[in-house]
Amino acid sequence: MAIWQGRSLKKPSGGRIVLARKKRKRELGREPSNTRVAEQDKRKIIRTYGGNRKVRLTAAAYANVFDKSGKGRKVRIIRVLENPANRQFARRNIITKGAIIETEIGKAKVTSRPGQDGVVNAILLEE
């Protein structure tokens, strides 16, 4: 079943709102990509509104980690340590923006949105 991102059909009192129009295609949503830690990167290209394209990262093996000086390195992701979006995501190794990941060079905080950008960018945390 499709995900609809239009206004709710219920009033705060619980009464029903009758729409003056049909649902529009632009109001459709999609399931979250739930980017997982894996052995290999896996991407999906999706057609979006206006014929544009969005790259979804469904499985991630590497992250671009930047230090305080701005120097970046491509390093392997080992696991997700914690995720403020949902504490179950850390247990399931799901990467979202703000997640703390363990990499080869230490802990890093994810700054990109892997399900929207198609890449994992992170900043190295001071120990």
Swiss-Prot record:
One GO CC term, this protein: ribosome
Top-level taxonomic group: Archaea
PROSITE patterns, per the entry: RIBOSOMAL_S8E
Molecular function terms from GO: structural constituent of ribosome
Keyword entries, A-Z: Ribonucleoprotein, Ribosomal protein
Metal-binding in keyword set: no
Any GO BP annotation: translation
InterPro entries: Ribosomal_eS8 (IPR001047), Ribosomal_eS8_CS (IPR018283), Ribosomal_protein_eS8_arc (IPR020919), Ribosomal_Se8/biogenesis_NSA2 (IPR022309)
The protein's assembly and partners: Part of the 30S ribosomal subunit.
Similarity field: Belongs to the eukaryotic ribosomal protein eS8 family.
Protein name: Small ribosomal subunit protein eS8
